[in-house]
């Protein structure tokens, strides 16, 4: 293979290999591709024109329903704007309402921007000390979920193989009849962060003594909860203080992307990565131990590559090295690759140098590994410092072992009624096949889904839930921290909040269906949060203040814990690697979660920040180097090639994408795709990796060994990947070889490449937009850069266009500066 680009920074594989086609098109901002080519083989006219709005309409998203339903009224009489309550809606003037975005364990304290009574944008709520004004792409995309015309628009009852609409009164009568005659009732729910909703569920179980609540999460953290209960006596997830940690070691925890509370963690992480002074500058050290390139791994200072099956061995190795340095008892080592073995020895010394100010975390769903992680943090003095149980996190409460018991009960025919509260186990539960078989034996199946997902489609009755922007509620994301959910628009369809449905089925309904849960919520806050201390006008003022701010904090008693656990038993119960040639890890990306957001076109067409692909999941394959910047990919596959993937006897066809940073001998595949009931947008997009998952001691495992991949079978005609950027005007010609190459960023290239022609982006000014250094050389590099800026001042004063002296005299007004240390994705 030809000699590749020796630049230290490249924009992709084609740039690195100096692909001839890439070099020819590098100077063009857009590739000329007629729309009819992009649409495939369908017969469409060459003059076909479309825009983003038409595209969304085709997928079933639009403002038509909102325009009819909402009119131009203030959303709901009892809602309080974030700033000033307007007497009337002013056309063209935005009003903000403090609320919360909650879905599938995700939490965001939000400000909902509305115009003419319609939500149009989600911003972060700066009043929240949990998310601190941050948001995610998922939270932003909830606006589009609201206007999804594929939402269920009325109560439904299955009639043979199709659903027919009925009135809420008719539904309530038949559901209450079924509940009153049922022997065993099971309520399947996800993590519930609402104190008021939990109270209501407790009352539901009292009303129907045969009822039980089963909780599970689409992405499980059950092992972490179980280990903390074993070691600290608390079944809770602690507050991980990334803002206090000088050294962070993460074993497969994508805490900047999708793990537990990424909005909160990103802000805290960035606070320790920001450099505010040149002399004596400090920042945290971050080491990521993983096999596939995660968003968090892409931000790490160092990555230690281990196979998924070696994660436990790596954790044991780190523990033993820390134990040696602290005088603690060591445990039996497990086989691990040599590079990781040597690197972990050095990491242990770094951690010891930051005792009490370090943090070791683990994203694996294995109790034994989490127990050893807890002991490592105990030896390092991190417990009650960087790991704080005083403000424990409530965003993960599920345990799939309860689902296994429910599956067994259903298959035995001992369950009469199952009620699904906004969950979709027929898609995202690890044993969906067994669950489906059992569900078929349940006489009454009820769902509160707001769209027709796989589970709702298998139910007899659907009581469609409001979207959260049409609902009332509260959230307790962390101990001592609360926020409210308030409606910002009238319900667009004939739906009803799930909590209101529960109240009606408990005979707690009032004449006004829209206020029954609001009054229940408000009364619960008055009695539970404020212990009835405020009444009358004083309480109304306090409530309005909380609703306006959107968040509330209470002082909680400090929680101090100590470690108690048996490491010998933990390591003896760990499973050794099978030492197979090929392994795969399954992960949650920042786009669609584990399918909760698959029906959202914004998130489907948002490029994955690592592999830059859209509209589907792709098998990430490694790239190997020969030591001279020549590289080849796994099985010589190229982006978009189709292969057969076989895992645990399951075979599926999947396209591949080459990813730098993927460990040799490993592959990766995102969860959340391959939905069979996800509207026009999500149905049939990608492959369902959930069917490839396995269990260990009842807990979902997100990797597999002994897999096989075929050679290239064909090419995915729908493969979509973001075009290269920052290529305009960067092509130059080597005067010695006449070979075209990328001349930009010449401050970073080897001497061989510095003999470039003038007239291109990097060569014109001898300036780059990317500079890098390390903390040790920062003062010297900063002085050099300052001197370089002084010598380049004449370029800032040079006019490109004549006749605009007055404008040029105003000077440059730079609009954006990106700190790549603090920007996490």
PLM feature spans:
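N-terminal export/assembly segments and adjacent metallocofactor-ligating motifs
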Residues: 2-338, 343-345, 462, 511, ...
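Short, polar loop motifs at secondary-structure junctions
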Residues: 289-294, 448-454
